[in-house]
Amino acid sequence: MRINTKIRYGLRTMVVIASSTGTEGVLQKDIADSQSISVKYLDSIISYLKLKGLIINAQGKRSGYKLARPADQITMLDIYTAFDRIEVVECLNNENLCPRKNHNCKANRYWDSLKTDFTTLLKNKTLSDIMN
């Protein structure tokens, strides 16, 4: 399983925003500069994080960004699923893709267990944990 670039940049963005102590939030340009991410690409990262309700504008349009809730209430699962669903193998999310769906596939149970374990791992790690 690979963690895609949007998830990695999303986490880095969240860490930068969470590290800010000011009330005015962190400007997108400052995040882009500090993380060597193009402003254009970061625009899409910011959109996903806002849509998921993880960040908000600090003081309206053209202001910086801040966390929508405290860092200890934002999990890695929140960040991960802002960009992608957890998919270990395709047949777990779409049983019509599996020709063995009616044959009690033992491998499917293993993949499902792996997905559950990975989800739990993400759910149990907060942004605050990562920063400390």
Q: Which functions belong to the PLM regions below?
A:
Residues 8-22:
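Short amphipathic alpha-helical interface segments
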Residues 54-67:
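Beta-hairpin "wing" of winged helix-turn-helix
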Residues 46-47:
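Short, hydrophobic-biased segments on the C-terminal half of alpha helices
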Residues 40:
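Key DNA-contact positions within bacterial/archaeal DNA-binding proteins
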Residues 68-132:
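Non-DNA-binding regulatory cores of transcription-related proteins
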Residues 26-36:
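A short alpha-helical element within helix-turn-helix/winged-helix DNA-binding domains
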